[in-house]
Amino acid sequence: MNILDGKSLAKKIKHNIKQEVKHLERKPKLVVVLVGDDQASLVYVKNKVQACADVGFSSQLDMFEKDVEEDVLLNHIKSLNEQEDVDGILVQLPLPSHISMQKVIDTIDPSKDVDGFHPQNMGKLFSGDLENAFIPCTPLGIKLLLDEYNIDLKGKNVCIVGAGFIVGKPLSMLMLNYDATVSVCHKYTKDIVEYTKTADILISATGVPFLIKDYMVKEGAVVIDVGISKVNGKIVGDVDFESISQKASFITPVPGGVGPMTVATLLLNTLKAYKQRI
């Protein structure tokens, strides 16, 4: 069993970005928009703002009360679209129920959509125009982690557990672009084990603690755990790490696997947005 160490790769990516930023005429700028006071979201956005500082980016955190009117938020995003010095705009998800996530995403200028969720960027991902797309951060982080350990996707059976908008759906399309044979399991999948057991690469993104047990995984599989939950005050993933690490050829830890890569790829996307704008 080998550990897919997202923490060390993210550190390397951040170091390379920091060196590059030193030679730029102006600092790339990311604006993070947070609606409400959800503690987990607050931790995530503070991590993103800190990561910007670590590599020499400029950043701005715009916070709104949870009962902010949808139009007020949309108009704020439109004003950020117009600001020449803003390269990336990220609206932290989830949003309160009275605000349409789709409307918010659609309002972000696609050239500043560093989360990669705008239909234009999703369309480029779907069509295979990866060079010009902003690929959503977690799927991109997973791909870079696989690359770092020379894990080829071509012809591999990839099973993704979780069909969410943020990870599962875009990840399935990204894997297809690299010639993997992809199956996606969700809450209506009748026999998940039938799919997980044949996977060369198994990726779980459900947020259900210890959902993936050792009997669901084939010997020598690569196992990537995107899930993050708290159980008895401890951060855990979707995967029963102790038992599955005995069977897997490679496995990500939680924490220290996919999480740091998601932040590192946000920085990569922001730098890409900056370069496309100059």
Swiss-Prot record:
UniProt keyword annotations, A-Z: Amino-acid biosynthesis, Histidine biosynthesis, Hydrolase, Methionine biosynthesis, Multifunctional enzyme, NADP, One-carbon metabolism, Oxidoreductase, Purine biosynthesis
GO cellular component terms, A-Z: cytosol
Enzyme Commission identifier(s): 1.5.1.5, 3.5.4.9
Positions bound to NADP(+): G162, A163, G164, I228
Pfam (any one): THF_DHG_CYH
GO-annotated molecular function: methenyltetrahydrofolate cyclohydrolase activity; methylenetetrahydrofolate dehydrogenase (NADP+) activity
Pathway: One-carbon metabolism; tetrahydrofolate interconversion
Family, as annotated: Belongs to the tetrahydrofolate dehydrogenase/cyclohydrolase family.
Subunit structure: Homodimer.
PANTHER family hit by this protein: C-1-TETRAHYDROFOLATE SYNTHASE, CYTOPLASMIC (PTHR48099:SF5), C-1-TETRAHYDROFOLATE SYNTHASE, CYTOPLASMIC-RELATED (PTHR48099)
Physiological role: Catalyzes the oxidation of 5,10-methylenetetrahydrofolate to 5,10-methenyltetrahydrofolate and then the hydrolysis of 5,10-methenyltetrahydrofolate to 10-formyltetrahydrofolate.
Name of this chain's protein: Bifunctional protein FolD
